[in-house]
Amino acid sequence: MELLARPLDELCAEARALRDEGHGHLVTYSPKVFIPLTKLCRDVCHYCTFAHPPRRGERAYMSIDEVLAVARVGAAAGCREALFTLGDKPELRYRVARDELEALGCETTLDYVARAAEAVLGETGLLPHLNPGVMTREDAARMRPVSASMGLMLETISDRLSARGGPHFGSPDKVPARRLETLAAAGEERVPFTTGILIGIGESRAERIEALLGIRELAERYGHVQEVIVQNFRAKPGTRMAAASEPPLEELLWTIAVARILLGPRAHLQAPPNLSYDDFPRLLDAGIDDWGGVSPVTIDHVNPEAPWPELDRLRRATESRGLELAPRLPVYPEWISGEWIDPRVMPAVLRASDSLGLAREDGWSPGEDVSIPFVPRDALPIDTRAELGEEEIARLFRARGHERDRVLAAADSLRREVCGDEVSYVVTRNIQYTNVCYFRCGFCAFSKGKLAANLRGAPYFVPHDEIVRRCQEAWERGATEVCLQGGIHPAFTGDYYLSVVRAIKEAVPGLHVHAFSALEIWQGAATLEVPLEDYLTELRDAGLSSLPGTAAEILDDEVRQVICPDKVTTAQWLQVHDVAHRVGLRSNVTMMFGHVEGPRNWARHLVRSREQQRSSGDFTEFVPLPFVHMEAPMWLRGQARSGPTFGETLLVHAIARLALHPWITNIQVSWVKLGAQGVAAALRAGVNDLGGTLMNESISRSAGAEHGQEFAPEAMEELIRSAGRIPRQRTTLYGDAPEERRLASFGAAPLAEPWNPPVKDARLVAPPRLVRPGFAT
């Protein structure tokens, strides 16, 4: 009880320090719609205007159509949460409720809550957060498959407030023991749960502390309490407590600060901003890290007299305390896992979330032809002179708002210092020689996507003479490079890759052959039963000039085991490139991000890339590849996010520039993934290279990307100049393209239609054993 005697300023200072320790500069809110499914209630709380008896001409429950109409408006406005708030068990008090439930085919209000929540989840993608009142363990289990989270305010631990004359007299569901039983039931059913206390209804400070300690004990026992709300009583006309005194702001601040001290730095602590009116920014001074649900489309039906502050005002108030505002989901990031989220809800949660488990802050996804949500703003760069370790890199990936602007500015400044204002690109042709593959990559729509128009198409295999024809055509159009990759056909051996290189070099000796990922190299060597060094040397002698850095995905095996378990491991990928560098073959390194991984995995990928470059020194560039989700199998199964947000995409390019300096100095952007507007923004975030003109591109298109298959030199240079930069046509190894090649690349003739004969015409025979390097470790 030492807390009772401490000065408010001292408590608030400690609470703020704890908040900053646990949550840094981040303050969240949940963009929501409020769905008052029924305003009938068997309880008669003396301060409540939400619940009322039946009214003539009014239905007891919203119809499903009405529920969906509200939810759809919210979804269109960018909401992520559908908050279901309702009276407690009205059917136990009112015949009209029982009759209406019977007509709806439901026995209880909870039955109807489940039906309405399921409709919202399935029809709109909004994530239901249910406040259905007191529940048993069986009730919680029934609600779990249709909700992302649930909640019930404990309100108070004091039984005396339920006695005659108290605000909860006549309200059986407000008995503290019953509400604590609901909190425990939710914990037993692994439900992410929100609870809290209501202050100013007659309880003492000591009773508030006792209530908070009761919440803490249940949180420690079950781990399910995701958020604690400290809500202040507001007197409302027409209630029995209309004349009651409201708690002063200092009392609310004291309670918030004490809650933070008792619950600790990692707890999520909320106070509703609308109930403090113009004083709401001061709530931050007491240690909250969340503003709760804020709706752009519906009122607060529980407190209709208190409108939510506009989002811009909320942001300004947050930033005035040196904090950053970010939208979240109704379920907090720490609870987004199979332990806490039902498999029927998880797909919607993943699709609504970003890499931190917060709400996607923009509607952008890689490959979509839509306007970019923002452009980098001028800002004072952060200091990045010291080499960044894994912890520092992971921390930078959490940057948002002004802090993100500073990261992007630092990357842009370093790019200017290292690369100047030139932006390079290479005239190349992509050739994917088959879309048949026996590996099981969950992200790949190229070999496993739907047979949709303009996407994967039918299985095919390109014969050598067609590969050679495309190379000759590319040479005539000014290309200096051909990039070859494809699926791993079960009949391929190392001899296949050798034969392709020899055929190309015999026909077009001046063309740089940039071909075969680490997976193809590993598989080729294994099928011939020769060491990697011998096989890579033979490829080099046949005419292979460099390796693409694809198949890297994320260089962290905890992610690879999920997305590509039979592919090369992290160590195997690094080994292939280490050996390639030793035999004189340069390569690049890629990173595919925005699916199941997060900032920690990105940081490990960058550190491992940097260490490999420090060791072998022959990576030419780093290429971030945002995950294109639309046709990816693991996204269609509900097992992946919808690609990175635009903010995350710019951060990956920028932090790659900062973290890889001075070892890898070229950072490339994929125009296929970002489109022209995205490329222009990336050029202000550390990027100095636009990659290849491609001529043909199938892999991103198979996944659903809408951007074109060729970015001609004329258009490439126009885009670069429009960004205030200087275009430079380069070779694969970053020399200047010969003038003869450059001249040939402008005004090139249209491409002939490529020939992709059906795979049945390939007449390849599979070997008796398939190489699966990921399963061999």
Each predicted region: which residue ranges?
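Conserved Radical SAM active-site core
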Residues: 54-220, 389, 448-604, 608-611
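Hydrophobic faces of well-ordered beta-strands that scaffold small-molecule active sites
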Residues: 27-33, 82-84, 128-130, 150-152, ...
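Conserved, mostly hydrophobic/aromatic
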Residues: 15, 45, 84, 152, ...
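Active-site phosphate/pyrophosphate- and oxyanion-stabilizing loops and adjacent acidic/basic residues
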Residues: 16-17, 35, 118, 141, ...
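Canonical Radical SAM [4Fe-4S] cluster-binding loop centered on the CxxxCxxC motif
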Residues: 27-66, 89-90, 413, 417, ...
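Mobile, glycine- and charge-enriched loop segments
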Residues: 27, 31, 41, 47-55, ...
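Active-site beta-loop-alpha junctions enriched in small/polar residues
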Residues: 34-36, 87-89, 131-135, 155-157, ...
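Auxiliary Fe-S-binding modules of radical SAM enzymes
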Residues: 1-9, 20-22, 68, 75, ...
